[in-house]
Regions:
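Residue-level signature of transmembrane alpha-helix interfaces in integral membrane proteins
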Residues: 59-61, 98, 184
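Feature captures the RNA virus RNA-dependent RNA polymerase
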Residues: 173-193
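Conserved SAM/AdoMet-binding glycine-rich loop
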Residues: 1-80, 85-87
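Flexible glycine/acidic-rich beta-alpha junction loops that bind and position SAM and/or redox cofactors
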Residues: 44-45, 49-56, 85-93, 105-169, ...
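Generic structural hydrophobic/aromatic packing signal, biased to beta-strands
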Residues: 12-14, 109-111, 172
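Short alpha-helical segments and helix-capping/turn motifs at coil-helix boundaries
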Residues: 25-26, 96-97, 159
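Short, electropositive alpha-helical surface patch
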Residues: 1-2, 29-31, 93-106, 170-177
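A generic secondary-structure signal for well-formed alpha-helical elements
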Residues: 76, 106-109, 113, 179-183
Length: 193
């Protein structure tokens, strides 16, 4: 009602719960219909079973992506997903297979690097050692225009694990960038047809 009357809010971005339920789809649909939400993001992280177990997301509802995409299609709600590159347990082959599985279903997919958050189990000394995790501090990407937010924020980004070394991880970022570029701009879709 306020958007119709005042023109605001223009839109906003929502981080949805990781264990989606039908109510989230309905809530997102209401926001979409009110013209304040462009789409819902279904956050997968990975399609690799071993990685899901290591990061303790194996039992999360969101891993049944087709249930949620089917529901979004039924109600006319645009959707996308996110995958995280750098999870322990993820290999070059499992990353490629998982990414291709997601985009082959016609799902637009954003890619992010795994960050070690303070207090998270993955950032513990035991996890770092067990999974051979190496990380580097990097400036937090996309936090807003530095002109308006001069304070730089940093995160510890995973750059290597015992499952995917530094060179392989760099190669997977490059491979994913090229593959995503081709997919999102329909180059590879046209070739596949």
């Amino acid at each position: 009602a306020s958007k119709k009357k005042y023109g605001y809010p223009k839109s906003f971005f929502v981080n949805w719960a990781k264990n989606h339920k039908e109510e989230f789809i309905n809530m997102a649909k209401k926001l979409y219909d009110a013209d304040v939400l462009q789409s819902i993001t279904l956050s997968l992280q990975t399609r690799n079973e071993e990685a899901l177990e290591i990061i303790k997301r194996k039992t999360m509802n969101i891993n049944d992506i087709s249930f949620y995409t089917d529901m979004c299609k039924q109600v006319g709600l645009p959707y996308s997903t996110e995958l995280m590159l750098g999870n322990p347990g993820e290999t070059v082959d499992s990353w490629k297979d998982g990414y291709i599985e997601v985009v082959a279903d016609g799902i637009s997919c954003d890619i992010y690097a795994v960050a070690l958050l303070p207090g998270a189990e993955l950032a513990s000394e035991a996890s770092l050692k067990e999974h051979g995790i190496e990380y580097e501090p990097v400036q937090f990407p996309g936090v807003a225009n530095p002109k308006y937010r001069p304070v730089k924020e940093w995160m510890n980004q995973i750059v290597s694990t015992k499952y995917m070394n530094r060179d392989e991880m760099r190669e997977m970022f490059e491979w994913t960038w090229c593959t995503r570029l081709g997919h999102e701009f329909n180059f590879t879709r046209e070739l596949a047809d």
